């Protein structure tokens, strides 16, 4: 066939994600361990699922009253409402004043895709986006593809081994966009908060929060997102990607909400109407299963309580693992203080190792973790904790004095 | 509060879709009928669902062996494979030669969103898109938002009351993109096909097929998409949006595939790799439920057979409704030939009324249908067929001589 291909100029795209996981999978060593799974693992190394979810899946499948019609473009309204109440608390100022709203989004990136499209059109002056380094790969790509300049930042101070929100003040130019994850881990004082807020306002920085694991930090749903209320009370307008897949264990049904907080209801309706237009072009009608499971649980007090308890159990287990790791390192006499392990909240925290130590673990011990040593602590269990802590000890000893 | 809103310049977006449905809903007349639902209706006016689907939903919810982990970026591989086999037939040339592939997409617009993004980047010369008028609203918006010039066309010849594929030849400028639905309804002769193909090649027109109801035209899955094989055999490269929600009755789980046919495997892999990159930014991991239900049915011969039979039953019912409408109009002595009703395949077909007649039905009879008189015949049932046919008769008589 002599026809020239239409696709002649299309090169093979570079793979962006999963190189660490790929190397892990190709490793034939039986001792190999992967410490960077995105989702929480059970003690048996399976993805964690809230006990209430399988029950709800069954109940939904057996319900003859459900209809399987298309959802409207803005998605499942009861899902959006229940999720916003979860995020802000039922009686929050923005809910009472009717100036918070949300659009049902698809997948882990959906809310960022939608929000970025909006910002590209309606905030032409904001073309630089700062993204926390741990999320640069999935979210950065979204903004990059649309022509934004993407820079990364980290709250983690690898010298002081603690979180530091001052990076926000130092790095951000005027009119930039900031994608912010769990800022409550930074433990700011009242006056530090005030300085931060003033600086953000002064620089006209647009905040795009990323709440993908509400409740997984402290085990307390309200406490985890309390800082959002503070921003609301200070008159900030912002976007927030609220993802609920991780906290229910419905990873296969990536579902979320692009939350919009505006100064008043009129502005909110304008923003939502533009978002709806974009959603229509993106996927028209979002799939329902994830939203249906979550809504059924959130709207039933008994099931909601069961879910909260399962989440609490997960967080207690994370704390226990961290305590054990710290204790084992202490018993091994590993140089350094390991308090930073238990000082950090949530499933994903920094081990506080340097690059040489990480390399040592990967190459000599077949323990796979990212270069910044931010690991998923739920990947550590009774079967592998001794091997992991002994290996960390070896890594630290072998690289002593190399800094 | 004196702060100026970030969203100050954002106007309220115009609503694009559903104005007919909205007017219908606001109509308080008890006789009102809506003839333009997107999905097939049962004789009781409920959305049609294949009998095999509820069973499969239950089976999936009860299966303890399933894992709920994230799907990879390219989606569920077994779903893509099973769907491609359905589209092309197991032993088709493109499958054997390994030059067809697909990406699991989300919602009814997902495949067009993904395909349009690709074409925007990799076919910079193709900036005009022709879309069949019945699908202009959902798909046109996708291309329009990305800066393409969108024009509409229709195979329906409202004078001759038949389908005419020659519009493709007349209207299309060089290097344009054509979104094509069910071309097999045009009943082209071998020589007309040959002329059409030569002209498309000569004008370097890129084809983007829309297969959203395979099997619903003739009741025969292979026959409905046979024309795709003809394009393949003639050395065409193309995209195809394959949507399976309508043919299974899983409207709430909008799921599909962006199908790519390339001249060889190497080209295919390049295109798929670029699509994967775009998918990552769009939704990262697609939701699984719709794909899981469909794959479980397609990969089980007994269930597949049950699904095919349910589809056949649906198509037979559509034909029966059309026959009845034609017969009732004949008995009423309605002027004109109504053969075009039964000459057209599928649930959605043209009634062949002019604008005055449509207006008459909407305003005087509370029967809601689009201006081009393309209706969903499954909205007609034993309860409303007499009222509908009598009203059509009145409409035709009352506007006689107005043309």
For the regions a protein language model found, what residue spans apply to each?
Chain A
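Structural signature of PLP-dependent enzymes
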Residues: 272-291, 297-326
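Hydrophobic beta-strand scaffold residues
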Residues: 35, 150, 207, 238, ...
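Glycine-centered flexible beta-alpha turn that most often forms the glycine-rich phosphate-binding loop
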Residues: 210
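Conserved core of the PLP fold type I
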Residues: 49, 54-204, 215-216, 221-229, ...
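N-terminal "arm"/small-domain region of PLP-dependent enzymes with the aminotransferase-like
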Residues: 2-85, 89, 281, 287, ...
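Eukaryotic N-terminal low-complexity, Ser/Thr- and Lys/Arg-rich leader segments
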Residues: 1-13, 309, 397-403
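Conserved PLP-binding catalytic core of the aspartate aminotransferase-like
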Residues: 306-364
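Active-site PLP attachment segment
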Residues: 224-270, 274
């Amino acid at each position: 066939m002599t026809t020239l291909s239409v696709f002649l100029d299309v090169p093979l795209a570079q793979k962006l994600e999963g190189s660490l996981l790929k190397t892990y999978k190709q490793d034939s060593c039986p001792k190999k361990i992967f410490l960077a799974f995105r989702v929480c693992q059970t003690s048996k190394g399976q993805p964690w699922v809230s006990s209430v979810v399988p029950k709800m899946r069954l109940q939904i499948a057996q319900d003859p009253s459900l209809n399987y019609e298309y959802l409207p473009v803005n998605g499942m309204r009861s899902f959006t409402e229940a999720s916003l109440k979860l995020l802000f608390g039922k009686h929050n100022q923005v809910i009472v004043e009717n100036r918070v709203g949300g659009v049902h989004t698809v997948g882990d990136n959906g809310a960022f895709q939608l929000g970025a499209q909006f910002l590209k059109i309606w905030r032409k002056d904001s073309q630089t986006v700062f993204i926390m380094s741990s999320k640069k790969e999935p979210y950065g790509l979204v903004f990059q593809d649309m022509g934004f300049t993407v820079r990364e930042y980290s709250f983690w101070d690898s010298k002081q081994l603690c979180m530091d929100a001052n990076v926000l003040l130092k790095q951000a130019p005027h009119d930039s966009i900031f994608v912010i994850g769990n800022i409550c881990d930074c433990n700011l004082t009242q006056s530090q908060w005030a300085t931060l807020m003033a600086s953000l306002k002064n620089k006209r920085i647009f905040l795009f929060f990323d709440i993908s694991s509400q409740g997984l930090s402290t085990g307390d749903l309200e406490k985890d997102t309390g800082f959002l209320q503070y921003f609301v009370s200070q008159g900030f307008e912002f976007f927030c990607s609220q993802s609920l897949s991780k906290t229910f264990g419905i990873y296969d049904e990536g579902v979320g909400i692009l939350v919009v907080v505006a100064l008043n209801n009129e502005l909110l309706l304008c923003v939502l109407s533009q978002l709806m237009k974009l959603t229509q072009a993106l996927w028209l009608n979002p799939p329902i299963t994830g939203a249906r499971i979550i809504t059924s649980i959130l709207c039933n007090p008994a099931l909601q309580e069961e879910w909260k308890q399962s989440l609490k159990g997960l967080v207690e287990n994370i704390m226990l693992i961290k305590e054990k790791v710290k204790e084992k390192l202490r018993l091994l006499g590993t140089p350094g203080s390991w308090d930073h392990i238990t000082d950090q909240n949530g499933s994903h925290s920094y081990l506080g190792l340097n690059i040489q130590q990480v390399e040592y673990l990967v190459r000599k011990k077949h323990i796979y973790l990212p270069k910044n040593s931010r690991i998923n602590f739920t990947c550590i269990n009774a079967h592998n904790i001794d091997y992991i802590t002994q290996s960390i000890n070896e890594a630290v000893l072998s690289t002593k004095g190399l800094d």
